[in-house]
From Swiss-Prot:
Reactions this protein catalyses: Hydrolysis of Ala-|-Gly bond in repressor LexA
Biological process, per Gene Ontology: DNA repair; DNA replication; negative regulation of DNA-templated transcription; proteolysis; SOS response
Gene Ontology MF term list: DNA binding; serine-type endopeptidase activity
Tagged with keyword Protein biosynthesis: no
UniProt EC number: 3.4.21.88
InterPro entries: LexA, LexA-like, LexA/Signal_pep-like_sf, LexA_DNA-bd_dom, LexA_repressor, Peptidase_S24_LexA, Peptidase_S24_S26A/B/C, WH-like_DNA-bd_sf
Protein name: LexA repressor
Site entry (Cleavage), positions: 113-114
Family membership noted in the UniProt record: Belongs to the peptidase S24 family.
Top EC class of this enzyme: hydrolase
UniProt source species: Sorangium cellulosum (strain So ce56) (Polyangium cellulosum (strain So ce56))
UniProt cross-references to PANTHER family, sorted A to Z: LEXA REPRESSOR, LEXA REPRESSOR-RELATED
Disulfide bonds: none
Function: Represses a number of genes involved in the response to DNA damage (SOS response), including recA and lexA. In the presence of single-stranded DNA, RecA interacts with LexA causing an autocatalytic cleavage which disrupts the DNA-binding part of LexA, leading to derepression of the SOS regulon and eventually DNA repair.
Length: 230
């Protein structure tokens, strides 16, 4: 395997230490805070280097999915306890031959008016999932849902939705829209005199925006997938 820089060794040690002490890996922000790296992109650069050199894998569709490779016999095929994987050493690790089949998606905690969707201060983490699971590739971002307005559509508070960025939508699409200063997830129904953002919850009223006040920039994207941590 390729050697590591001092910073890469420090990042890997921190990930292993976190799993050993807490039972799960750190988030990007936790790694950044520990290492004094202000940018999540900077953290990702180190993680990608560790993956490329065979010291780390990131499992699909999981927020805290950093996994040091078990290099002493269990292999990268899974099944080994994470705590065992972090303390074992070794001399070789298989490359990830599915790298080209994955896409990295940023997950944001909130969306605010006047800032880019992927403003660095809003990015919670990144996930890597199969390209076939989301249409739109790098135009897709993840958003953590809060609230119960879409429960009848199977979208619950705490779920992660995948959103394809676009300024248009078809009638009946589930969209993410910026209304006022807050983002909302609703069904999209353009009517003659207004646009109706309809919740999937019989206990909640729709949000009505007059047609004259509606602007395409209010639409941040169309929901193309939902992920729920069990």
């Amino acid at each position: 395997m390729q050697g590591l820089t001092e910073r890469q060794q420090q990042v890997l040690h921190y990930i292993r230490q976190s799993i050993s002490e807490r039972g799960y890996p750190p988030t990007l922000r936790e790694i950044g805070a520990h290492m004094g790296i202000r940018s999540t992109n900077g953290v990702n650069d180190h993680l990608r280097a560790l993956e490329r050199k065979g010291y780390l894998t990131r499992e699909d569709m999981k927020s805290r999915a950093l996994r040091p490779r078990d290099l002493d016999g269990a292999g990268a095929g899974g099944g080994a306890d994470l705590r065992g994987a972090l303390v074992n050493g070794g001399n070789d690790a298989p490359a990830n031959d599915q790298e080209d089949d994955l896409v990295e998606i940023a997950v944001v905690g909130r969306i605010a008016a006047g800032l880019p969707i992927l403003a660095e201060e809003h990015v919670l983490d990144t996930v890597r999932i199969e390209r076939t699971l989301v249409r739109g590739g790098r135009e897709v971002f993840g958003l953590r849902v809060t609230g119960d307005s879409m429960i009848e559509a199977g979208i619950f508070s705490g779920d992660y939705i995948f959103v394809r960025r676009q300024l248009t939508a078809q009638r009946g699409d589930i969209v993410v829209a910026l209304i006022g200063d807050e983002a909302t997830v609703k069904y999209f129904f353009p009517e003659k005199d207004y646009v109706r953002f309809q919740p999937a919850n019989a206990a909640m009223a729709p949000i009505l925006v007059r047609a004259s006040d509606f602007k395409p920039a209010m639409l941040l994207g169309v929901v193309v997938g939902v992920y729920r941590k069990l």
